[in-house]
Amino acid sequence: MIRTFEMELGGRPFVVELGKVAELAQGSCMIKYGDTFVLVTACASKEPKEGLDFFPLSCDYEEKLYAVGKIPGGFIKRESRPSEKATLTARLIDRPIRPLFPKGYHNDVQVIATVLSVDQDCPPDISAMIGSSIALSVSNIPFMGPTASVSVGMIDGEYIVNPTSEQKELSELELIVSGTKDAVMMIEAGANELTEAQILDAIMFAHEEIKKIVTFIEHIVSEVGKPKSEVIVKETDSELLAEVVSFLDTKLANAIKTVDKTERNENIKAISAEALDYFEEKYEGRSKEVNTILSKQIKVETRKMITSEGIRPDNRKLDEIRPISSEVGILPRTHGTGLFTRGETQVLTVTTLGDLRDAQRIDGLGEEDEKRYMHHYNFPPYSVGETRFMRGPSRREIGHGALVERALKPMIPCKEDFPYAIRLVSEVLACNGSSSQASVCGSTLSLMDAGVPIKGMVAGIAMGLIKEEGQIAILSDIQGMEDALGDMDLKVAGTENGITALQMDIKIAGIDRNIMETALAQAKIGRTHILNKMKEAITSPRTELSAYAPQVTKLKVHPDKVREVIGAGGKVINKIIDETGVKINIENDGTIYIAAPDQESARVALEMIELIVKDPVVGEVYTGKVIKIMDFGAFVEILPGKEGLVHISNLAHERVAKVADVLAEGDLIEVKLMEINPQGKIGLSRKALLPKPEKEAPNKVE
């Protein structure tokens, strides 16, 4: 039976259709938002996976190019690996729903969102996020939702729900918020130096819209929802728990307080091994239970130590930042480098400058575009002292790279002021938490070292939260252990003036406005401290680019002159490129960018183009090249691509019988421009520049 439900979202109808397609999935729905259609399905395995200590959830976002009437490019005419946008959207679907499954539920769960049709003003990512919540909520899968998601923009101080593509161009904020009726679960934001108060107001505005959507989904579930499967989770043996806690005594707490990460892990590992050996001997075959209890006790002890004693695993205060060091210019042949170290986290970021043709072409479900500023983040296994196969970038690496890219984007100069493509690569050399925010700092240092005139320095900090038995501890600059065992991961990047990027994931309910307000205020203090430390290495962008960076020169010509610079079949522009070794990029408005390996090549190419676009002037004298001999005269090229005729009568004062008697093809001669007729044809004279012969005196008759 087909059921249709409708509400208004962002001033447009949002329609949910159930019971028509994908009926064999445990949960499915078709989302129709304007002309955007997204099919979302949810399925779970019948039995849990044995031996897992995590929840095996996978979320996929499939971009079908037929949704925008395109055929995939290349030799293989079908969609292949997900685009960066698809990967980021899959992460947006995953993050708010993952905490809402029962603890101990280890069945495989897969959510697939397939984009079937795209209306650029009705975002398919938001449709997919809401659709995933609906598909899970109406299924028998034990999902403790529903959740909902909205996008928020800000124009002239006013917040807009799900802004259109035109509104996004004007917006100072790009915010996506997911949550339940009671709490915000996930935030992803990019902003143009907005204040903490503006960001917080936008989040609260989004949550009010989320509440309306959740109420709408609850109505759908009440009408068509299936009974939820029962989750049987084995309870911890209270007697065994008490024995393990007694055995650990204060040893575990002391091990957790070890400052050095590697030493701390070794100490915890040694105590755990000792406990496992002891209880295996005492209760044979119960090692798995003991191991589960040990993992829980590590979390309990760490959280209790932070909330009750105000002590963190490395003995820092709650708002204390780890020691920071910054360096620039450490790689001699690169265009710019920044090495940022914070505690045991270290990131090297390298800047590479290229000409505008190096910009990345974006050809997905959105309108065709190109990206001249890119950031890529790499997290090799050695950064955490581990081994693993190194293949392509993981979803996490793509997500972190996009976050750092968003943090720096408002500071990147426009193409007109800095006509370069910019690629940043952050290599995580060592990691004990906050590597993405260390990449923000390293990227700022690297850009400044490269001489990119950024509008301001950007720093990033990761904040954490522990909420235990009514006690709340907000942590600045969290390390890996605090991230894993905490209740919130809040990453904030910005300048001294405001926030440029924000990402938040919350694992528990009950994070209210006051907590977020306190966390953002504490993050600002930490961010300012980090910026001051970064200034010890470099305070402003270098005034000169690296000697190894391309030299880009900009020239503006009348649009009508563009065809003259290009020439028939590209003849003129290819000649310039061949003779000078430069790269040339021409835009429709007449802006020409010349990228050269050195300043001399740039100068020569610039002069050649200036000559091409220069208009011939009547009365001017030119040195031209004879390009063709005719019976009636010679054609002479006076400027690149511009030629005129020297009529045989204008070659010399005396009578010339044959043009070839005076000139040959390839000769360089001086000519004067005598006229340009209404058809644009140029008349030249060689004779006008030659001295007139003296008249012979008449013979005297005796």
Swiss-Prot record:
Subcellular location: Cytoplasm
Keywords: Cytoplasm, Magnesium, Metal-binding, Nucleotidyltransferase, RNA-binding, Transferase
Domain S1 motif: 619-687
Catalytic activity: RNA(n+1) + phosphate = RNA(n) + a ribonucleoside 5'-diphosphate
Enzyme class: transferase
Family: Belongs to the polyribonucleotide nucleotidyltransferase family.
Designated name of the protein: Polyribonucleotide nucleotidyltransferase 1
Gene: pnp1
